[in-house]
């Protein structure tokens, strides 16, 4: 790998600390893109970690917003499997 250089005040710096910092920046950027686990003090669900500027492929894009809608409509995770049929009464309750 080539050396990492940064121009600060006209001087080129190549230091292990700077290299680690830039490697960590690129790692965090990569994890933002793929929505993987990122070391953070905030526990944010993975769909919300994906930046809005990146347009995901169709199914993943829809899955992100479907998952967010599930969290909004079913915050306690009850009836989450009945998401698409939530307007219809279940046969057990029809008496």
Curated annotation (Swiss-Prot):
Residues 1-20 form the signal peptide. It comes from the Eukaryota. Keywords: Signal. This is Blastocyst protein 4. It comes from Oryctolagus cuniculus (Rabbit).
